Structures are given as structure tokens and as C-alpha cells.
Amino acid sequence: MNPAYFLVLAAVCVSLLGAANIPPQPLSFYRYTEMIQCTIRGSLTYLDYMDYGCYCGTGSRGTPVDELDRCCQTHDNCYAEAEEHPKCSSLVKSPYMNLYSYTCSGGTITCNADNDECGAFICNCDRTAALCFAKAPYNEENKEIDISKRCQ
């Protein structure tokens, strides 16, 4: 086998093995993370908000540990509302699968008028949370907490 082909094949295999450990993310998650990046600008990224407090990332139970965690709780509740929304009830229009459009300019997020009813609802959920994140202080001690003890 040509060494160049072997190197390409090996690189693809290593990439696939690494990607196998990454859980699939809902389509709207990408829009949400882009919105967060639009509003927070600076050293924090959306990854800093994963596994934060009782509501940011996986979890969603108990009493929020701070203002930022309340932003995530509000976002979770908004998505729960969206799941009950008549225009978001099908698999294709699920809050987690529906893509919407928006613009970001100077930290200002605008949900586009061409979104369907479900997309507009989800866009507003994500927009509200991203703006909330921009105002809430980030407390390093609330990252990767023991949710079994602190989120009752």
C-alpha cells in the first residue's frame, strides 16, 4: 500500500474513533451556542457553561445555585413549553431539531421574521437565555459540582 494512502486512512480512523465518544447534539444546540458566543464575547465559551450548576448542560433538577444557573433553568423551562407548542409537536418541528435564523450584531440578537412559528418560539428561548448569560456572573466554583449533593 502506498504510504500516503496509509497515512490518510490512519488519520480518518483516528478521527472516527475520537468522534465516537462525542454525543450527538440537537441541531438547535448549534444555534444556541452561536448566540451565547455572540453575547458573552471574551474568554468564556459555550463549553464553560456545560456542566455548570444544576441546570446548565445535563441535569435539570433542584434549586439553581446562582443567577447563571437560573438562566439555564429558564431556558430548560422554555424548551419544555416549546415541546407542548402545537407548531413544535412533530419530529421535524421538535424544538431540538428545528433550525431557525437570526442575526447577531455587536452582542444584539434578532430572531428573523422568516422563522416559522416553532422556529420563532425556539429562537426566542435561546435569545433570552443568551442575553441572560451575558448579564449573569460566572462563578468557577459552580462548574462541575456534585449534583447529587447540591441539586436537591
UniProtKB/Swiss-Prot annotation:
Residues 20-27 form a propeptide. CDD domains: PLA2c. Expressed by the venom gland. The active site is at 75, 126. Ca(2+) binds at residues 55, 57, 59, 76. Transmembrane segments: none annotated. Disulfide bonds join 38-104, 54-151, 56-72, 71-132, 78-125, 88-118, 111-123. Its cofactor is Ca(2+). Keywords: Calcium, Disulfide bond, Hydrolase, Lipid degradation, Lipid metabolism, Metal-binding, Secreted, Signal. The keyword Flavoprotein does not apply. GO terms for cellular component: extracellular region. Residues 1-19 form the signal peptide. Pfam families: Phospholip_A2_1 (PF00068). It comes from the Eukaryota. This is Acidic phospholipase A2 1.
